[in-house]
Structure formats: C-alpha cells, structure tokens
C-alpha cells in the first residue's frame, strides 16, 4: 500500500485498468474504425496518385469533429466508471477508509481515465500517420493539428464530466447533469428570446448572435470548429488586381477556442478536487451532494420547466392558431407558473427522497411564484424601457435598415446625419403607433378586404453606436395608410421620407457601388430600353468606361433628387410607360499583397447591380444619349 501522503497510487491505477478495460477497449476500437481503417480504404481506392491534401482533410475532419463527439460522449462514460464508487454507500465508505488521502484517490482516478482516452488517440493517429506515409500522403502538420484538437477536446469534456460526478451521488444523474449543462445556456437564451419576441414590441433578438453560447461548450465548439481550404493570392493581373486561387491545403479554424476550453478543463479538474475534499461520504445516493448547490438545483429546475414546458403548453393549448400580436401575457405566465411549480416540487422530492415536501418547500414555492409574477408585470409595463428606447442621433455611428412594403423597398447601411435622423424619425413613429399596430395584428391575421390598409410593412433597424454597442429592433406585420402621407410623424410620412433621402435612394439602386470608397470596380454592363412594356426595343452591352459614366450620372441624378419619389404603396420604378434597365457588372479589388496567408473566400469577388432609369433622370438619359443609345424623345426632355 502506498503512503498516505502519496499523490499517485499505482495499485489503484492498475486496478482501475483491470476493472474498466472493456470500456477502454471499446473506445480504442471505435477510434480505429473512425480513423486509420477508413483512411486506408480511401487511399487504397484512390484513382491515381493520392494527394496529400485529401489525407490532410480527412485527418483534420476526424480530429476536430470526431474528437469533439468522442470526447463529449466518452468523457462522461469514463468519469462515471472511474468515480462510480461515489454512487454506492458501501464502496464510498470502503475507499474513504483506506489509508490514502482523498487527493490521491481523486488524482489517480482522474489520471486513469485521462490516460485511457489519450492513449487511444495516440494509437489511432499514429496508425493513421503510418497509413498515410505508406501512400506518400502524409502531412505531419495536419496530423499533429488533428491529434492536438482531439486531445484538447478530451481534456475539457472529461474534466467537465468529472466535476459533474462530484456533485451527485446518483450514477444516472451524472449524464443528465452533464448533457444539460452542455446546452443549458444556449437553450435558455433561446427560450427567453422566444418569450421576449412574443411580448416585447420591436424585439429582434432572433437575428442577433447568441450572447451566452460560450457557456454551452458542445454547441459553441460545433459552431466554431471548421476545416476549410486555404486560399492564396497567387499573382497580380495586368490591371493591377490580384487573382485569388484556392490552394490545395486545408486549415482547422477554432483551435484557439478549443485551447481555451482545454485550459478551462484544467481549472474544472482542480475545482472537482476541491469539491471532493469537502464532500461528505454520507451524501452518497443523494441527487445533489453539495449543500450550497441544492438551492441552485431546485430553482434551476423550476425556471427551466417554466420557460420550456410553460411556453410549450400555452402554445399547444392556445397558440397553434395565434400570432405574436395575439399571445396573452397573463395566460403564458399562468402556464409558466403551473409548470414551474411542478418542476420546483419535483426537485424537492428528488432532494428529500420523499413525496411529502409541501411543508419544506412552500416558502420557496411562494418566492418563485412572486418572482415570476413580478417578471410578467415588468414585461407588460415595459419597466426596462426597452420598447420605447431610441438612441440619440449623436450616438449613432451608422445604421443598417431593411424596409419592405407593397411598393418600394430599402436595404442598406446609412451613415449621413440626415439619413440617421430620418431613420430615427421612422423608428419613433413605429413606437408611437404601437397600440394601433398591435390592434391590427390581434384582430385577424388575414385583413378583410374592406379594411383601410394600403401597405404592409416589415421594418428592421440596427444601430451601431459610437461606444461599441449595437441596438436592434424589428417590426413585422405592420400597416401604413396613404391617407396619412401628409401627417407629420405618421408611419406613412416618416417611412416615405426615409425611402427618399438621397443616401438611401442611391444605395437602393447602386448597392456596393454607391460608396465612393468601395473597392469594387466596374467591368461592363448591359442595357435594355423598355417602352410601353415591350423589352428589346434597344439593348446591348456596355464597356467598363460606359458603365463608369452611367454610375456617375446615376449618382448625380439621385443626389439632385431627379429620380421619381419612392413609395410604400406602389412600385415606382416599373410603373411608367418608359424606362431603361441597366445591369452593371463589377469585381472587388483584393488589396492584399501576394502572400499565402488565408483569405476569406466565402465572399463573392464579383457581382452585378441593377438600376432603373426613369424619365425624370435627365443626367443619366443625357449620358445614354451621348453613347448613341436611343430613347423616346418625349421622355428625354432635352
């Protein structure tokens, strides 16, 4: 027997290997079936000479995603095996009566599981490397990166699982805690956003990135890890631009995030030791063994049940044929209160191992009920000021706007002071019209034919503030009325003013080309003169020089207000008897120097924008005439 002050117990280590070798063997076998054997088959069946990049891609894919899944699944299995004695009273008393410190027990059991998992990885990746080398397709960098990713995943998930084992004395509770905590933050954030989206006017959290996803490790790593092709800037073209060509190599992104989680895993392992040192042997068999964690478990179950089951019950019973404007906040809170109390008392029963929990849990139930009701009251009265908040114009660096209607639409980024002021005015008009907009939504989703609705609106605004904050609001299924166009501050008047501000009008037509500082350059285009609805009266291609001339003319027309006013109620671009359709082609200039550094290859390097030239746009019509493009004399106006 080792000394009581020893950090590592060899006898216990060997005993663990003897007891749990089937789990170890199964883990090794699965890794062999995942990595070296499929790689061997792929390289053996390859037509021609195997490419190193193909083997590298497979190694990185398995190292990242296979390591993530295997580490997450088998991490809890090995933790349950190595610390299974903590869930049986006799085994717990037996281990703790040994002349071995708890630190030694913890370290030995922890390292046994870690050695089993890491040794399997080393064996599998070593065989994969030998296989690739035999076919001349070995990339040591990719092999090492893939192995490192798998080891880091094991380190975090196994440590996390061990920590979960320290908090429970029930063997089956450990995987439940472990699985729940891996997705709890992102799940609760989704449920809270769903609740807010139903009852907060203008809430746009659905489109915002998850704020607390990093607290859900499995979800975050699935989103972050990615194996992508490395793009390289290979050569400079004659016009001074760079040609981006995909390279044959692959890279694993997200490895830094995985390294952070692995470092957190080491911290979790130390925390597990601290919890184990203070864990009472008598707590074996309890659902939660740590006293301070029992209230967290109890109220956590209540909150999760309220937001998940409560909203689900309300939706199934009342909400299948409803829409956001028709949801009842009191009804939803009542369902959440019912399911939350069920969850609360269920947790009490698990903690006390008895059905008689009313006396011990009634105070906590009242506290939970009061908090939930206060939450509902705060939502209904908008005590946080969320619905009515708009930033000051001086605080806004730029604003992204999306506005769709029965007529024209707008989707662009605005940074001019006038544009920001008009956006804020339209936003405030939507806030002031809240009661009427919601009343239309509650009346019926299908508006009757005789209802005074001229246009449906969908309005989304995202403010980027100078202090780095982002404010998002979204208003869907709204209405605008043409009879209110001349009423200052009305939805129709402010939205129309926003559509027709020079910056918005120019951006609506020219898109990326509207910005003088854009790195896009024109390569040509196409024109088509449409008269009385007939296409093909006069059409043809445009040179790059002609396209640049037309863009300058379009910019002058829009800045001078020559274009027809945009409307919420009709499509102004195609409503006339004469117009010219322009399709302008552009490419995006790559500013990077010739290098092999990774470049974002997901964004398009070329594209096109369409512009409609109406009879009022005299500058553009003059430019077309100067190019010899015939237009109806009555429309040219010169």
Explain the meaning of each model-derived region.
Residues 359-368, 375-638:
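Function-determining sites in protein domains
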Residues 172-185, 360-372:
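Central hydrophobic cores of alpha-helical transmembrane segments
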Residues 63-91:
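Long, hydrophobic alpha-helical segments
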């Amino acid at each position: 027997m080792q000394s009581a002050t020893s950090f590592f117990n060899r006898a216990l280590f060997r005993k663990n290997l003897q007891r749990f070798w089937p789990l170890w063997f199964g883990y090794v076998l699965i890794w062999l079936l995942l990595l070296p054997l499929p790689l061997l088959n792929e390289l053996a069946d390859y037509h021609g000479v195997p490419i190193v990049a193909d083997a590298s891609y497979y190694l990185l894919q398995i190292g990242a995603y296979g390591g993530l899944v295997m580490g997450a699944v088998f991490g809890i299995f090995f933790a349950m095996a190595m610390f299974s004695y903590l869930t049986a009273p006799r085994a717990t008393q037996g281990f703790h009566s040994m002349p071995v410190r708890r630190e030694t027990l913890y370290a030995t059991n922890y390292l046994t599981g870690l050695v089993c998992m890491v040794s399997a990885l080393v064996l599998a990746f070593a065989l994969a490397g030998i296989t690739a080398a035999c076919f001349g397709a070995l990339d040591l960098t990719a092999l090492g990166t893939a192995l490192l990713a798998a080891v880091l995943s094991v380190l975090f998930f196994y440590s996390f699982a061990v920590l979960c084992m320290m908090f429970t004395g029930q063997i089956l509770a450990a995987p439940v805690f472990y699985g729940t905590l891996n997705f709890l933050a992102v799940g609760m954030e989704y449920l809270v956003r769903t609740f807010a989206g139903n009852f907060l006017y203008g809430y746009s959290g659905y489109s915002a990135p998850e704020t607390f996803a990093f607290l859900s490790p499995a979800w975050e790593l699935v989103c972050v890890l990615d194996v992508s092709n490395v793009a390289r800037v290979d050569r400079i073209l004659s016009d001074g631009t760079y040609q981006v060509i995909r390279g044959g190599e692959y890279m694993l992104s997200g490895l830094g995030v995985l390294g952070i989680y692995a470092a957190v895993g080491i911290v979790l392992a130390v925390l597990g030791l601290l919890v184990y040192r203070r864990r009472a042997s008598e707590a074996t068999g309890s659902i939660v063994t740590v006293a301070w964690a029992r209230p967290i478990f109890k109220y956590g179950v209540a909150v999760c049940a309220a937001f998940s089951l409560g909203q689900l019950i309300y939706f199934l019973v009342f909400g299948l044929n409803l829409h956001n404007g028709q949801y009842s906040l009191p009804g939803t809170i009542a369902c959440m209160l019912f399911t939350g109390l069920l969850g609360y008392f269920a947790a009490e029963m698990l903690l006390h191992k008895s059905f008689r929990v009313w006396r011990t849990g009634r105070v906590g139930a009242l506290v939970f009920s009061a908090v939930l009701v206060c939450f509902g009251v705060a939502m209904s009265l908008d005590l946080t000021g969320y619905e009515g908040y708009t930033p000051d114009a001086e605080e806004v660096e730029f604003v992204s706007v999306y506005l769709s209607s029965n007529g024209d639409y707008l989707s662009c980024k605005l940074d001019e002071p006038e544009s920001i002021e008009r956006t804020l005015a339209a936003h405030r008009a939507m806030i002031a019209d809240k009661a009427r907009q919601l009343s239309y939504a509650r009346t019926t989703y299908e508006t009757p034919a005789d209802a005074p609705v001229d246009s449906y609106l969908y309005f989304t605004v995202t403010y980027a503030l100078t202090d780095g904050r982002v404010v998002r609001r979204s208003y869907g299924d709204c209405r605008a009325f043409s009879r209110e166009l001349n009423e200052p501050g009305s939805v129709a008047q402010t939205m129309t003013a926003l559509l027709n501000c020079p910056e918005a009008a120019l951006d609506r037509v020219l898109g990326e080309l509207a910005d003088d500082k854009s790195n896009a350059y024109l390569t040509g285009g196409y024109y088509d003169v449409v008269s009385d609805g007939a296409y093909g009266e006069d059409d043809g291609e445009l040179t790059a020089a002609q396209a640049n001339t037309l863009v300058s003319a379009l910019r002058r027309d829009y800045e001078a207000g020559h274009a027809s006013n945009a409307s919420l109620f009709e499509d102004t671009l195609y409503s006339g008897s004469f117009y010219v359709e322009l399709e302008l082609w552009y490419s995006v200039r790559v500013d990077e120097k010739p290098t092999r550094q990774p470049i974002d290859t997901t964004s398009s390097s070329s594209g096109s924008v369409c512009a409609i030239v109406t009879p009022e746009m005299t500058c553009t019509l003059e430019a077309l005439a100067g190019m010899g493009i015939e237009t109806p004399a009555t429309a040219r106006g010169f």
